[in-house]
């Protein structure tokens, strides 16, 4: 039998291991350099790498493992790499949403994850562009056949992500949040 303390230690260990793997993927694959777009690349990386617990990524990886087990399949090295790719993309999308959420026109948050928000560290326009770049990088990465070999799987993932992020998903939820904050007299049906 496991005690609650043992389970928490195991969970924290898995979460930390997963976070390191996602950070490694992001560090290796997000753009970097000293050229024309160096500030943009730095801002993208600032809000993505070594930032946050990466719980969404953890859930992607662990769900993939679980689904393999219940379908009596082993997680191959290539399937695990696909899970890490998808998990990293979801973290990049989450970082993009947080960068935009912190902007003065939205929540105007000066800090995020224990450090200055992207727009505070850089400036508003760099933060907007860093978020936009993370968003497009996510779809570029999923569409790249070097990461996920099966073209139908890539198309399915892109569709599912776009639907979850779009006007009836995360972005629509942000709009509703903004409307609720400026119009506190919304009906229950509108909420």
Go through each PLM region and give its residues:
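Intrinsic disorder/low-complexity segments enriched in polar/small residues
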Residues: 1-2, 74
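N-terminal amphipathic/basic leader segments beginning at the initiator methionine
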Residues: 2-30
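Mg2+-dependent prenyl diphosphate-binding active-site environment of isoprenoid biosynthetic enzymes
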Residues: 30-191
């Amino acid at each position: 039998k496991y005690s609650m303390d043992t389970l928490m230690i195991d969970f924290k260990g898995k979460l930390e291991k997963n976070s390191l793997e996602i950070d490694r993927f992001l560090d290796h694959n997000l753009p970097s350099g000293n050229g024309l777009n160096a500030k943009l690349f730095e801002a993208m990386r600032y809000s993505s790498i070594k930032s946050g617990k990466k719980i969404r990524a953890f859930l992607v990886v662990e769900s993939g493992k679980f689904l393999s087990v219940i379908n009596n399949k082993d997680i191959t090295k290539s399937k695990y790499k696909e899970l890490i790719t998808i998990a990293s993309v979801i973290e990049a999308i989450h970082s993009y949403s947080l960068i935009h959420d912190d902007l003065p026109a939205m929540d105007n948050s000066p800090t995020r994850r224990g450090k200055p928000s992207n727009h505070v560290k850089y400036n508003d326009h760099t933060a907007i562009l860093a978020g936009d770049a993370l968003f497009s990088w996510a779809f570029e990465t999923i569409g790249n056949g070097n990461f996920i070999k099966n073209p139908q799987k890539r198309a399915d993932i892109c569709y599912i992500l776009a639907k979850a992020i779009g006007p009836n998903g995360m972005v629509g939820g942000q709009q509703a949040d903004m409307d609720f904050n400026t119009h506190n007299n919304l009906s229950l049906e509108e909420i």
